[in-house]
Structure formats: structure tokens, C-alpha cells
């Protein structure tokens, strides 16, 4: 018998049979993991199984490769976000992006900590810049981090103003020349220079979205990025 105990956030839930549910969670030590919750559709347990909920999880299976079953205890509910359209959109985007980005059962402890901190921040104003930084971390976890430290053409660290949509590397204003309109504008927020304006967050998310879409293309099989992320971008564009 295989067994472990861990803490995780619920990414998704679907009914299984008459009274059970299959949940997917992102855990601290075991990564993205699915399992059955017996009685998960019951009046007692179903209210606990809400996306974003932080859970104390015990997983058991006869063999490691089996789906196995979870027992769950609530640690933190995030149902308060149900009344906050932007916060709820952020939560749904986080859950959807973790689902499509992470391989099953592969630990990502730093990303887990940062994801929990971001989920905790969603009920406070001013969290979109943190979401942008989180997507940059997500890019790094896919193996494709942006290189914004120096100009890809000249090697200079000064006057970095653009990002190449091909390489993800910074380009200085002088080196861009006539190619500037084919490059992404580089918001100072991505360089960690000063507070991020709403426009800079939108510019930054256009960059991370471009590269996440490209890197995730084999997993998406021609499908677009998760609708939950598109919904968040739509709301941020109106803000």
C-alpha cells in the first residue's frame, strides 16, 4: 500500500459515479496530482471541494501508478472571492494555468509556495503585478525563462526597451532600429524598476502569454490557452 500526506490547493473537481468526485490538486511535495474522493459529491464534503481551496490531503493507493484515493480536510476556503469578479477570475486563471503547464506528479516546491502566496493575495487590491511575476515563474518552470538582463544584439544593459518575440531576450532602443514595431515593448515592471501600472501589467502579460502559448503548444494540441486566462485578460483590459 502506498500512502502520503501533503498540503495542496484544489485545481479542479468533477463528479465520479453516484457520490464520489475526482479532484486534481497542486501539492507542496508531490506536484500536480489527481485522485478519487469517496463521498466527494455529498452535502458534507462537496462544499469543501471548491477551486483554490487549501486542503490537508492523505493519498492512498495499492500501487504508485494507480490514481488512488484522497481523504481531505479543509485548511483554508477561498469562497470569499465568489463575490469579487476580478479576484475570482485570477483564481480560475491560476488553477487553469497550473493544470495545463505542470506535468503530473512532478514536485515544484518554489512554484507551490509562490502560487499559495498569490492565491492568498487575491482578496486584497493591487495583486495583478504579482500575477504577472507568477506567470514569469511559470515560464521558468517550463524551461523557458525570459532573459531581460542585457541586449541580445549589443550586450548592453542600458536603455532596454523591447523583447524579441522569437528569443524572449531584451533588445535596447538603439539596437531595435526599424524592427521596433515587430518587438514587444518591455515594461519597466518586468525589470523590477518601480511600481507596475495597469498598462505595464497588460504589456507584461502579453509577453508571458505569447511565450507560454508557444511552449505549451504541444500540450494544447492546437487548442488556445485556457479560457480562464483569456477571461482574466479581458477584465484587466477594462480596469
From Swiss-Prot:
Keywords: DNA damage, DNA recombination, DNA repair. It comes from the Bacteria. Disulfide bonds: none annotated. Coiled coil: none annotated. InterPro entries: ARFGAP/RecO (IPR037278), DNA_rep/recomb_RecO_N (IPR022572), NA-bd_OB-fold (IPR012340), RecO (IPR003717), RecO_C (IPR042242). The keyword DNA-binding does not apply. One of its GO terms (cellular component) is bacterial nucleoid. GO terms for biological process: DNA recombination; double-strand break repair. PANTHER family: DNA REPAIR PROTEIN RECO. Belongs to the RecO family. HAMAP family: RecO. Involved in DNA repair and RecF pathway recombination. This is DNA repair protein RecO.
Amino acid at each position: 500500500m502506498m500512502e502520503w500526506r501533503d498540503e495542496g490547493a484544489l485545481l479542479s473537481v468533477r463528479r465520479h459515479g453516484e457520490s464520489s468526485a475526482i479532484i486534481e490538486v497542486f501539492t507542496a511535495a508531490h506536484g500536480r496530482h489527481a485522485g478519487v474522493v469517496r463521498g466527494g459529491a455529498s452535502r458534507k464534503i462537496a462544499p469543501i471541494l471548491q477551486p483554490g481551496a487549501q486542503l490537508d490531503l492523505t493519498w492512498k493507493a495499492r500501487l504508485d501508478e494507480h490514481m488512488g484515493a484522497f481523504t481531505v480536510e479543509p485548511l483554508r476556503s477561498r469562497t470569499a472571492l465568489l463575490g469579487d469578479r476580478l479576484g475570482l477570475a485570477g483564481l480560475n486563471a491560476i488553477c487553469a494555468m497550473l493544470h495545463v503547464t505542470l506535468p503530473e506528479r512532478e514536485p515544484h516546491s518554489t512554484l507551490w509556495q509562490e502560487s499559495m502566496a498569490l492565491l492568498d493575495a487575491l482578496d486584497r487590491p493591487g495583486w495583478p503585478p504579482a500575477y504577472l511575476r507568477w506567470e514569469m515563474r511559470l515560464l521558468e518552470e517550463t524551461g523557458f525563462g525570459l532573459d531581460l538582463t542585457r541586449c541580445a544584439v549589443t550586450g548592453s544593459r542600458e536603455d532596454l526597451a523591447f523583447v524579441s518575440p522569437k528569443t524572449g531576450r531584451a533588445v535596447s532602443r538603439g539596437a531595435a532600429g526599424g524592427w521596433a514595431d515587430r518587438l514587444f515593448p518591455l515594461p519597466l515592471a518586468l525589470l523590477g524598476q518601480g511600481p507596475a501600472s495597469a498598462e505595464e501589467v497588460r504589456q507584461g502579460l502579453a509577453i508571458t502569454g505569447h511565450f507560454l502559448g508557444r511552449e505549451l503548444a504541444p500540450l494544447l494540441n492546437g487548442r488556445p490557452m485556457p479560457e480562464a486566462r483569456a477571461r482574466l485578460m479581458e477584465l484587466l483590459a477594462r480596469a
